[in-house]
Amino acid sequence: MDINASGQSADISLPTFWTPLSENDVILLRKRNRRRRFDISIVYAVAARCSFGFPQVLVCRPERKEGSPFPTLFWLTCPYLDRKCGELESLHKIRELEELFSTRPTEVARWHKEYALLRKSISETGIDIPTGVGGIDSQGAPNAVKCLHLQAATWIGWRYHPAADWLQKEFGAAECSNGLCGNCDRPP
């Protein structure tokens, strides 16, 4: 996405790799999220699927049905990646990523700005949430990392991240080897 001199997006085009949510996706997501409060109506599209065809990352609408803002554009839904994020967080990788962000201020600032523009571009009401990635204060704390789940979801779902090299190194494989997550009746 290009940003012109006035800070406005010169080209708001949605990624062509996003796909609509299918009936099978809805069934699977309801099973995966049966222990969470998960509002399927907030889902705009599937941003990424694994090689087994299951949703890994969802694109969420920037506003809930009642109109309140929802700043998280990309939502990680893959159980394998969810577990991997938890493992990395337990190894204090959030701090490491924040330190890396501090060495890439221009890239991180652009990432937050383009994320906000993308989020606004899919808004049905034109809601303008004045924050960066996942609701992070992109002005006051641009290097803050809320969680690795948000980072992984944005990296995989948007295919754009200022620390893509670091994420690739830390995550290695971005999916499980057997598609077990498609069977939600037993743990993956």
Model-inferred region functions:
Residues 2-188:
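Preference for intrinsically disordered or flexible, low-complexity segments
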